[in-house]
Amino acid sequence: MDKKINVFFGKYKFNTILGLLSIGIAFYVAMFTKTDTGYEWYFLIPGVFGFLLLIVRPLSFTDTGSIGPLILNYTMVIKYSISPLVSCLGGYHSWLGRYPGEDNINKAILITFYEMIVLFFENVYLTKKYKRKQINNVEISKPLRGRVAHCVIIVLGFAILFAMPSAFMDYRFLFDQTDLATTIRVDFAGSGIYKTLFTFARYSLVLVIVDFFYKRNLKRDSAINIIGAFIPTLLNCLYVSNLSRIGIFAPLLSCAFLIIILFNTPKARKTILYGIGTIGLLFIIYLSFVKFFGEGRGDTSNATSWLWWGDTLNMYFTGIKETAIGIKAKSLIDETYGLNRIALMFNDCFSNVSFISNLTNHDINSNKLYNIVYFGGNISVSQICPNICEGIYYFGTALSVVWPALFVYLSHLFSYKSHEKEYIDLKFIYIYSAIYCGMILMLNSAMIVCNIINISVLYAVVAFINKKVRIGVIKR
């Protein structure tokens, strides 16, 4: 009896709490969802999700060593548990976009249920697999292999910032609230490459500073070294494009978790985690309020409206309405591409990748066509097409879950590789990729692929060059 209690309220007590909460939400949604809305079976998603959390182990909500899966686990809770509750409280009200129709909502609930089941069990299997592999590994962390390439990138990136200010018109500091109503778009030739080089420079500067304090800490363990490494990570998040929350969240997490790996003591881990949690949460809350309710952005009365929050949460976590519109958009996708799904996938995945994006057609990628259906015309491209819908476009309904499942696998693989690699820059490459793959339920494939290639893959090239330069210097 004691063993059973320990399973539920010991190591996995957080799973038990979330599982019971989800089941409670399922009962609430079942009782208070009106008929003829299309959402009558919505309660099954939080209900089954909660049941699985109770009986299936070992998903962790506290394992900071697996950053990609950790993010995935929390976003699953929001999409499959919290979102149904908030949507129900708001009466499934929609304040943005067109109504997709009851039939498409029914299909969206079914496809979301399918997605949840497959991703949950895949996540459990991969968690067990990589946990077993990590037990046999001893993690080693080493400083940067030279700084020559990083210093060149820093000089080049910041030189571009000052020489080509027009390429960075959409960038602003976090606390700059001027002209909030305008979303600035910069798309002239070469602007994407300039931004990539500047982003490179920012990360290189952070890595060089982190490397400096890590070397100091190897000689003498001190909290000052942890703080010194964390400050540039924090400053790196203050200057972002159009006050993007992902633009703050991803850099903050990727660099902070790198610091956790390097300064791997219980005291350091706790200090950094509390720092990330407090500062990150304050930034996200502040930025969300500014973007939603700042001057010219929206009505402040929405801040206390369940109707508004229910629909907004669905937008950010690819909810039922968003999936239903994605299903409705399939006819437009078919009309545009016919059977040529390779062209569609190429347009989707590489539309924002530096040096390749000019080979794609932005006007007919799935996100553009999705937004045409979403708004009923060529009005905006602000909404994100869910990955499960892109899976439907590429592989059909039966195999649609293959697409998000691929990124779930990569989130586990990259998280594991971040511990397997020894050098700081290589660890950063895999941490950054793991974070973006872990946000699969929040982002579309274009956003994930472009960040992995623009930053991680190109950074791997820089790491390789840095290694060769260092070897050449040593041989001399």
What do these predicted regions represent?
Residues 34-42, 127-268, 280-297, 371, ...:
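Membrane-embedded catalytic interface detector for glycan/lipid assembly enzymes
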Residues 67-80, 151-165, 279-286, 346-360:
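Hydrophobic alpha-helical membrane-insertion segments
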Residues 380-476:
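Hydrophobic alpha-helical segments
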